[in-house]
A protein has these predicted regions:
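Short, hinge-like loop/turn segments at secondary-structure boundaries
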Residues: 85-89, 128-129, 177-179
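Acidic, PIN/NYN-like endoribonuclease modules and their adjacent C-terminal/linker elements
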Residues: 1-33, 149-184
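Short, well-structured N-terminal submotif of metal-dependent ribonuclease cores
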Residues: 1-76, 80-99
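Conserved beta-strand scaffold positions in the cores of enzyme catalytic domains, especially
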Residues: 67, 110-111, 178-183
Length: 184
């Protein structure tokens, strides 16, 4: 990816009309199919693992794969460790659960967005904010999704996510990027 701002902007020429989420029938869901490889997990996967919400099919698929992870998903999860009230009786348990996930990641399987990815993600976030008339408080979430999506693209991965809305819009803006969705 280029670190040239003008070149990056030139690649993004979306219309000025609001993007529409496509119907589920037009999107890749992994309800009963094998997951593509290589696969990069979105934060929703870890959250759903912690809550025990994954289907048996998806559990089998996850057990079969050697996934990629992203430092952005790690930051989204570990943010909770600081956000939760340390005096609350359940905080220690949640922190241990999060630590058990991120400490398990092999360092050589963690993608870290580089400068070019950050630049492209910022541009995509701005475009989505403009086209979707997004609230300022949604910018951080959108930026994180764009960072994960573009990191996957840079490394030839497909994102696995439950977040259909945001990753569908990202795929519409950057058709070379790939995501596959699951339901809980």
């Amino acid at each position: 990816m280029s670190t040239d701002l003008v070149g990056t902007l030139a690649k993004q020429q979306p219309s000025s009309t609001r993007l529409q989420r496509r119907p589920n029938t037009a999107l890749p869901f992994c309800d009963a199919t094998l997951l593509p490889e290589p696969i990069l997990y979105d934060t929703t996967v870890y959250i759903d693992v912690l809550h025990g919400k994954l289907s048996d099919h998806l559990k089998r698929e996850i057990a079969r794969l050697e996934p990629w992870h992203c430092s952005v998903a790690e930051s989204e999860m570990t943010y909770l460790c600081g956000r939760l009230d340390p005096a609350h009786y359940g905080t220690g348990h949640v922190v241990r659960q999060i630590a058990s996930i991120v400490d398990y990641w092999p360092p050589n399987r963690v993608l870290i967005p580089d400068r070019a990815i950050w630049r492209e993600a910022a541009i995509l976030t701005g475009i989505l904010s403009r086209l979707q008339h997004a609230r300022d408080e949604d910018r951080g979430r959108t930026m994180n999704d764009a960072l994960i999506f573009l990191s996957a693209l840079q490394h030839g991965c497909t994102v696995l996510s439950r977040n259909v809305r945001d990753f569908d819009l990202l795929m519409q803006l950057v058709p070379a990027g790939k995501a596959v969705f699951y339901r809980i």
